[in-house]
Amino acid sequence: MFATFGFIALFAVLGAWARYGQTLLVQAAFGRGFPWATLSINVLGCFLMGFLFFETLERISVSPELRTGMLTGGLGAYTTFSTFSLETLVLFENGEAVKGLLYMFTSLFLCVGAAFAGAWISHST
């Protein structure tokens, strides 16, 4: 259990650094007019989550502690959108398309709505 926490902490630091570094690079290249940095992080993070989840499950032998550190710590710090995408993918792969669609649209509506609500509360205080 302590090894798992250690790997999560280590990879979380690396994931956060990667996110910050990529944000600086993308914003320097494309500016801040559109959230290209966040979009690129979310897309790459989702790709890596899907890829590493199955690679470390089916092809590459790594300890469960290291796997959890990479996926939960590293990609969790890099982007939480990758976890949402993996959970949606798993629902579809398990033949639960209706549940997957419900989860996708509910998450999008609630999360964007929560962001708007937080902004509204912040602006009104």
From Swiss-Prot:
Family to which the UniProt record says this protein belongs: Belongs to the fluoride channel Fluc/FEX (TC 1.A.43) family.
NCBIfam families per record: crcB
Descriptive protein name: Fluoride-specific ion channel FluC
Reaction catalysis annotation: fluoride(in) = fluoride(out)
Membrane topology designation: Multi-pass membrane protein
Top-level taxon of the source organism: Bacteria
Amino acids binding Na(+): G76, T79
GO terms for cellular component: plasma membrane
Molecular-function GO terms, alphabetical: fluoride channel activity; metal ion binding
Pfam families tied to this protein: CRCB
GO biological process: one example: cellular detoxification of fluoride
Coiled-coil annotated residue ranges, if any: none
Entry keyword set: Cell inner membrane, Cell membrane, Ion channel, Ion transport, Membrane, Metal-binding, Sodium, Transmembrane, Transmembrane helix, Transport
Residues that span the membrane, as ranges: 1-21, 34-54, 72-92, 101-121
